[in-house]
Structures are given as structure tokens and as C-alpha cells.
């Protein structure tokens, strides 16, 4: 891990999106001020990292700076984080989960490549995550329930934001179909491909019923 940590010293911000949930809030807030209005929510997100870990230190540093300034911050990953480089293959994704824990992610969405080490391996990995995996449309057909929590609601100074996870219905073909089947080739899991839009809309409606003032869809699609 020492060599890994040395690699992480290269600073680069993977991505940052600022979402204002109150009227008249500028798109980008000035983070140099020592005081904060607390009226913005910073959603820091990463996507398709594919084990390219060099940007994580800057993301962690930026997140820490915002929190120190009293800002509301949520950090999310939109999928395909744990596969793509030797660090992922050699640890079957566990090293990336450890790094994401250190960064301080709140939520993550399973991308199609999260399943490349097998479904069971990924499900075991999620148990070691300090953040929550979300997916509204990844369903266990044996129970009829979603494998992960469909959405999560966070309260920011009295305003509530819901984060909905969306997996690509193409995960079957972009990963390994047999991982989602029994020994007879019957599918045990679904990505709600036949009811995709209805499933997502129903989840949005449920989040609204739970008091969400804003709904943010975090999807790994395409």
C-alpha cells in the first residue's frame, strides 16, 4: 500500500458539480471565504475512474476544504470505479473500496464493470464500504426486492435532497451474463429493462413522498 499511497500524491480533481438548492445561489461558490452561507450543496462526483487513482487525493482535499468552510457536501461515484488497472485486478476491487472509504464517499452506483470479478465478489466488497451503494433498478428476482437501497435522502439545513441510483440495463451484456443466472441459465436478477422508466419514475415519486425537495439521479448509463 505504500507505493499506492505514493501514487496518490499526484493531485487532480476528478470532477465537481455544485448544485444550489436555494434561489439566487450562484452555480460556483467562492470556497476561499472563511465563512459560508451554508445555502449551497456541493455534489462532488466521479465516474468511470477505472482504478485511475491519481485524482483521489485532490478530491479528498477539496472535500475537506469545503467541509472546513462549513459547506454542505455530498460525494458520490457513478460507477466503474473498481476495475481497469492492476490495482483493481490484483485486489479484486478491494483496494479501491479502501481508497473510497478514505476519501469519504457518501454514495456509489454500481457500474457494469463493478461485476467483472463476479456478482458474489462485488456483493462481498460492498460490505466493506463505509458508503452506501444505491440502485433503484437492480432487482433480486427471487425476492422481488432491490439488491441495494434505491435512494437516500439527506437533509441540508431543512432542505432535503434525494439521491437515486440507476444502473444501466445493458449490464447483462456489458458484464458476464452467467453471473446473474442459475446453473440452468435462468436469470436470478434483473435491471428492470422492461419497466425501466416506470421503475425510475416510481422511485422519484417515492422520494418526493419521503419529503425530498430535490431529486438527483446518479446513473451509470451507456
What residue ranges belong to the model's regions?
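Generic low-complexity, intrinsically disordered sequence content enriched
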Residues: 12-13, 21, 63, 70
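Acidic, metal/ion-coordinating pockets
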Residues: 30-222
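Short, intrinsically disordered, low-complexity terminal segments
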Residues: 12-13, 24-26, 159, 209
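C-terminal segment of classical bacterial N-terminal signal peptides
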Residues: 9, 18-27
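Short coil-to-helix leader/linker segments, especially the first N-terminal amphipathic alpha-helix
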Residues: 12, 16, 20, 54-56, ...
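Bacterial N-terminal signal peptides that target proteins for export
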Residues: 2-12
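Intrinsically disordered, low-complexity Ser/Thr/Pro-rich tracts
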Residues: 1, 25-30
Amino acid at each position: 500500500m505504500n507505493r499506492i499511497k505514493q501514487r496518490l500524491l499526484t493531485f487532480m480533481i476528478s470532477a465537481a458539480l455544485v448544485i444550489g438548492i436555494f434561489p439566487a445561489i450562484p452555480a460556483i461558490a467562492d470556497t476561499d471565504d472563511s465563512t459560508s452561507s451554508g445555502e449551497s450543496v456541493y455534489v462532488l462526483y466521479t465516474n468511470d475512474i477505472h482504478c485511475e487513482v491519481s485524482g483521489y487525493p485532490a478530491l479528498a482535499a477539496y472535500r475537506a476544504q469545503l467541509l472546513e468552510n462549513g459547506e454542505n457536501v455530498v460525494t458520490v461515484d457513478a460507477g466503474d470505479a473498481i476495475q481497469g488497472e492492476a490495482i483493481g485486478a490484483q485486489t479484486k476491487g478491494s483496494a479501491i473500496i479502501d481508497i473510497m472509504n478514505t476519501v469519504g464517499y457518501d454514495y456509489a452506483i454500481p457500474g457494469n464493470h463493478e461485476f467483472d470479478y463476479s456478482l458474489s465478489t462485488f456483493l462481498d466488497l460492498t460490505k466493506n464500504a463505509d458508503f452506501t451503494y444505491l440502485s433503484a433498478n437492480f432487482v433480486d428476482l427471487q425476492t422481488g426486492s432491490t439488491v441495494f437501497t434505491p435512494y437516500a435522502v439527506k437533509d441540508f439545513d431543512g432542505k432535503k435532497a434525494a439521491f437515486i441510483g440507476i444502473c444501466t440495463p445493458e449490464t447483462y451484456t456489458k458484464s458476464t451474463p452467467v453471473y446473474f443466472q442459475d446453473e440452468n441459465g435462468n436469470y436470478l436478477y434483473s435491471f428492470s429493462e422492461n419497466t425501466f422508466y416506470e421503475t425510475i419514475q416510481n422511485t422519484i415519486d417515492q422520494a418526493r413522498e419521503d419529503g425530498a425537495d430535490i431529486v438527483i439521479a446518479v446513473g451509470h448509463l451507456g
